[in-house]
Amino acid sequence: YTNLTEIRRKVFKEVSALAYEKADKSVDEIAHQMEELPYKIIPGDIATYRESVFLERAIVGERIRMTMGMPMQGVDQPEQISDGLEEASRPEVYYQPPLINIVKFACNACEDNVYRVTNACQGCLAHPCREICPKEAISFVDKKAYIDQEKCIQCGMCFKVCPYQAIHHHVRPCAAACGMDAIGSDEHGRADIDYEKCVSCGQCLVNCPFGAIADKSQIFQVIQAINEGYTVVPIVAPSFVGQFGKGSVGRLREAFKEIRRSEER
């Protein structure tokens, strides 16, 4: 259980509550509540996870939209979180592709495929890292190895021969997790998805430590369908067993039965 899990669950909880309340409220009232959600999920005026509480709320705002199946907005123009709510409120509406999205201003722009010397370097006499480098990119500064990134071609030979494992291969977590080599970098060094290659497996989402990658959901539309009397059949993925903690299987089974009984009344 991580901070990312907590935020994700808070967003889903609030969006679900909003969907159930919609049956008794106008679109304008729900839109007003949507605008208040980032302040409810991220209270106070002191940042908890990032350098600014405003950034935290902006990211949560994008997560709220994606949880409702709506497209991201970005921060380059003035828009409200609730823009497009009326269209998204229809139970038959499908989320707008792509499924997997990168919140650019949440991305840490992690370095990718970079070799760096750590403080584990012993400054040994043999200097195998320097001797094997085909581009003469390694020198010694204060008796410690130093890699010139302008010359380095990321061949990894120094990494392989260091007897102290003092050279670290830094890779971007989301890119390392992607089996389709679909993640590159934009002009600012932030992660960027090539949707021609992406298969929406979600591995990048799971492995991003900054929670900058999120998927779209239709929980809002599903609840609308339930409220309006549509026949909704839940199909539970087997993976749910490991997602809600110990002792949750029986409780969830009873919850599903209760939902069904509520619909039949």
Ranges and model annotations:
Residues 155-156, 190-202, 213-217, 221-223:
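Terminal amphipathic helices with adjacent charged low-complexity linkers/tails
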Residues 141-146, 186-194:
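Short linker/helix segments within small regulatory modules
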Residues 209-216, 232-243:
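Core AdoMet radical
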